[in-house]
Amino acid sequence: TWGDTPKECYEATIRIISRAMDWLNEKTAGKAVFGGAKSSALDTGARREIATKLMPVVRGLIGADEKKAGHFDDSQAVLEFVCSNRLEELAGLGTSCPDHFLRTKIRPLVVDFDPAKPDIDATIAGLAQAVNDYRDGYAAYYEACKHPDSPAMRDPNAVVYLVPGVGMITFAKDKATARISG
């Protein structure tokens, strides 16, 4: 077992996680993360301005059946991922654990945005199609995997929207869930 008491279980969990983190840090020291940088992050003001323009548009596209709260994250870890060479490839792999699967669907939606040539109007113009394509993909996934006793398909909209050079936008039924989903 992990321990005879809740405290021993907690301490064992922390010990194992710390060992895993030490191992990972040792193996990745000095190496480019996510295939290195493909683009640079925009400055803080530009990131916030773009997120401020994108969020109400996305919310309008996905919130017809259920109101959504949004959250924007442009932390260093998020920017490292959304600016990386392997963003599309790794995002396409989908979630990494069952909890993520339940909260974030099978994968995020990578927004078509080029931080080297930021054209927010073109990005917004393409969002409806991107959202519809995501919904269609989710519905096809559900149909391929469902069983006779499966629950009805959940909301087919993406929860996580990754914007190169900008950050991550998440939407859920409330602010706390939107924040946790990232």
Predicted regions and their residues:
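Catalytic palm active-site di-aspartate
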Residues: 1
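Domain-length cofactor-binding catalytic modules of enzymes
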Residues: 7, 11-182
